[in-house]
Swiss-Prot record:
It comes from Influenza A virus (strain A/Chicken/Shantou/4231/2003 H5N1 genotype V). This is RNA-directed RNA polymerase catalytic subunit. The gene is PB1. Residues 249-256 are annotated as: Promoter-binding site. The keyword Transcription regulation does not apply. The lineage of its organism: Viruses, Riboviria, Orthornavirae, Negarnaviricota, Polyploviricotina. It catalyses: RNA(n) + a ribonucleoside 5'-triphosphate = RNA(n+1) + diphosphate. Phosphorylated by host PRKCA. It is found in: Host nucleus; Host cytoplasm.
Length: 757
């Protein structure tokens, strides 16, 4: 019989059907090739939004800069970046009036954090622009290179290990007449391969010293490298994102720490919380507006969209905000916080790799690096690119473009949220002084606006006033892309609200399945995802049970570990059948060893090894949990591991899962091809750095919280700690006299070697 699909929904409240509208199957689009074009778009657009501003020239770098602040008031609905300083300051003052003490308290909290933060805070984060090599590197390597070069140029405040002292070095480095750096270069030679007798290109990497004069150094210190944002769904065009260098990062971190403290205290802010906490916070605002709208009042909600949020924000405005927020604070603190916006007012955008040309007829390819765009003949380019290059040329210096206005993506999310909330805050009746009033939610550039008024005209007037107020601080609400509805139905940061936030389970679909780390981690992650969705996303018991069965099936196909008694033939089945036959307690075999699945929705929180431990044969236990098993290169095992899960929409989320170490927790070996490239030295540095840090963490297990202070080097700290620990262990009888003597001898040897060095 045919089933009429609409019957399925008869008993379902409409909001629960949202999961059936899931549009994102398949892989998201990734970018290939160069991001130069996208970066030029960003630079040109940003200048266009501020074109009526004043042009000046930076005296140090010679870069032309456009300042739109206090520019003309808008006369049309086009997006613009002409924020008015006095309006921003007034919005801040009203925000403080509504939340007495909010700035003062946040400053005190931040001051404490500033004095305690260690420089290794900057090792967090992925790709970072490394100014010494003029390209991207992992954050830890970029920091190590920066510190190494600072020290060789006589900047040593950073040796205390405090971030604030490293920032002192950054400030001093900008005053130096020149900086000497070590940079890598490649030599390419064509040689004949002995084995294949073909000609191959051999690369060797060399290091050379180079002197940067003040101007060149400043340009590098103020540079943001750009890349193309990957995996963005629902867009036809890619866009550029920026990664700043180590000089900027520390200052940005402190500004964002202050802004985060403020956001935490603002009920309209969707940052820095997430998940259920965020939903609860936001539901409160909606509830307030709905209860306060008396029976006679109308209440409407705008699902808002801002045009080019980042490109219309201005670092000079952020400087004004910080100056106001910190106005009663000590001078040193105000200075530290004002440096980030000042650097951003003078920032340079690196144009990336440049363009690749190829001639089909002659089978030739050639790269035109960004540095050449300033003076290359434009006849080689198509019309569109020609226009871009012509427009950007006056701004170019050494392959970077001067970009004073605009903020680049994702740099000051917290601080720009504070600005947005300050406008929402002005919607209180005591400020609007009329019959309409508004409130709302703000999370970086995303907002929802709730307007209450006695009639439709009032609602319209309220929206208009909000729109115009935003314009005064450089926020451009897009009338085309914003959508108004009766309060009770709206969307905010991919949360859909209909009489409460609706669980949109389909958004989590991409994270179901086998991750492909190893058999042990994949099993654990798979069941944890299902468990988390039962807790957070209304995944019901029947659906969860089905998801679990599908996951186990998927897992068995991925690792070819069908049950020992199944008829499916794979290249592992011979071994698994043998194991199955010689195992007494078959229920104890892990799924990855051809065992049965004992998971159901009640025991998803228990790691599989623990679930089956009592059921295992003794010799199987011994093989499974054997740290000396020669076939497994083991990770250090923590009780909890972290993985990244990708929802369909929005940022990748970090997720914890239980990690029980078994011989299935293998790590694939690193691909060899990297070892033959210029990256090799960097890889070795990074591994050495990693090893040292791991060793250090072993000696000071809580070292992520309290590091030893005032001891001159890591090695000495570890040696002295080893001696203390050994003495305690010896006196309490945990180690024998011989072992104690051996430890002491090793410690002395290490110290001796250090002295000789």
């Amino acid at each position: 019989m045919d089933v009429n699909p609409t019957l399925l929904f008869l008993k379902v409240p409409v909001q629960n059907a949202i999961s059936t509208t899931f549009p994102y199957t398949g892989d998201p689009p990734y970018s290939h090739g160069t991001g130069t074009g996208y970066t030029m778009d960003t630079v040109n657009r940003t200048h266009q939004y501020s074109e009526k501003g004043k042009w000046t020239t930076n005296t140090e770098t010679g870069a032309p800069q456009l300042n739109p602040i206090d520019g003309p008031l808008p006369e049309d609905n086009e997006p613009s970046g002409y924020a008015q300083t006095d309006c921003v300051l007034e919005a801040m003052a009203f925000l403080e009036e509504s939340h007495p003490g909010i700035f003062e308290n946040s400053c005190l909290e931040t001051m404490e954090i500033v004095q305690q933060t260690r420089v290794d805070k900057l090792t967090q984060g992925r790709q970072t622009y490394d100014w010494t090599l003029n390209r991207n590197q992992p954050a830890a390597t970029a920091l190590a290179n920066t510190i190494e070069i600072f020290r060789s140029n006589g900047l040593t405040a950073n040796e205390s290990g405090r971030l604030i002292d490293f920032l002192k070095d950054v400030m001093e480095s900008m005053d130096k007449e020149e900086m000497e750096i070590t940079t890598h270069f490649q030599r390419k030679r064509r040689v004949r391969d002995n084995m294949t007798k073909k000609m191959v290109t051999q690369r060797t990497i060399g290091k050379k010293k180079q002197r940067l004069n003040k101007k060149s150094y400043l340009i590098r210190a103020l540079t943001l490298n750009t890349m193309t944002k990957d995996a963005e769904r629902g867009k036809l065009k890619r866009r550029a994102i920026a990664t700043p260098g180590m000089q900027i990062r520390g200052f940005v971190y402190f500004v964002e720490t202050l802004a985060r403290g403020i956001c935490e205290k603002l009920e309209q802010s969707g940052l820095p919380v997430g998940g259920n906490e965020k939903k609860a916070k936001l539901a409160n605002v909606v509830r307030k507006m709905m209860t306060n709208s008396q029976d006679t009042e109308l209440s409407f909600t705008i699902t808002g969209d801002n045009t080019k949020w980042n490109e219309n924000q201005n670092p000079r405005m952020f400087l004004a905000m910080i100056t106001y927020i910190t106005r009663n604070q000590p001078e040193w603190f105000r200075n530290v916080l004002s440096i980030a916006p000042i650097m951003f007012s003078n920032k340079m955008a690196r144009l990336g790799k440049g363009y690749m040309f190829e001639s089909k007829s002659m089978k030739l390819r050639t790269q035109i690096p960004a540095e050449m765009l300033a003076n290359i003949d434009l006849k080689y380019f198509n019309e569109l690119t020609k226009k871009k290059i012509e427009k950007i040329r006056p701004l170019l210096i050494d392959g970077t473009a001067s970009l004073s206005p605009g903020m680049m993506m994702g740099m000051f999310n917290m601080l720009s949220t504070v600005l947005g909330v300050s406008i929402l805050n002005l919607g209180q009746k005591r400020y609007t002084k009329t019959t309409y009033w508004w409130d709302g939610l703000q999370s970086s550039d995303d907002f929802a606006l709730i307007v209450n008024a006695p009639n439709h005209e009032g609602i319209q007037a309220g929206v208009d006033r909000f729109y115009r107020t935003c314009k005064l601080v450089g926020i451009n609400m897009s009338k085309k892309k914003s959508y108004i509805n009766r309060t009770g139905t709206f969307e905010f940061t991919s949360f859909f609200y209909r009489y409460g936030f609706v669980a949109n389970f389909s958004m989590e679909l991409p994270s179901f399945g086998v991750s492909g780390i190893n058999e042990s981690a994949d099993m654990s992650i798979g069941v944890t995802v299902i468990k988390n969705n039962m807790i957070n996303n209304d995944l019901g018991p029947a659906t969860a049970q089905m998801a679990l069965q599908l996951f186990i099936k998927d897992y068995r196909y991925t690792y070819r570990c069908h049950r020992g008694d199944s008829q499916i033939q794979t290249r592992r089945s011979f071994e698994l059948k043998k194991l199955w036959e010689q195992t007494r307690s078959k229920a104890g075999l892990l799924v990855s060893d051809g065992g049965p699945n004992l998971y159901n929705i009640r025991n998803l929180h228990i790691p599989e090894v623990c679930l089956k431990w009592e059921l295992m044969d003794e010799d199987y236990q011994g093989r499974l949990c054997n740290p000396l098993n020669p076939f497994v290169s083991h990770k250090e095992i923590e009780s909890v591991n972290n993985t990244v899960v990708m929802p369909a929409h929005g940022p990748a989320k970090s997720m914890e899962y239980d990690a029980v170490a078994t011989t299935h927790s293998w790590i694939p070996k690193r691909n060899r091809s990297i070892l033959n490239t210029s990256q090799r030295g960097i890889l070795e540095d990074e591994q050495m750095y990693q090893k040292c840090c791991n060793l250090f963490e072993k000696f000071f297990p809580s070292s992520s919280y309290r590091r030893p202070v005032g001891i001159s080097s890591m090695v000495e700290a570890m040696v002295s700690r080893a001696r203390i620990d050994a003495r305690i262990d010896f006196e309490s009888g945990r180690i024998k006299k011989e072992e104690f003597a051996e430890i002491m001898k090793i410690c002395s040897t290490i110290e001796e070697l250090r002295r000789q060095k």
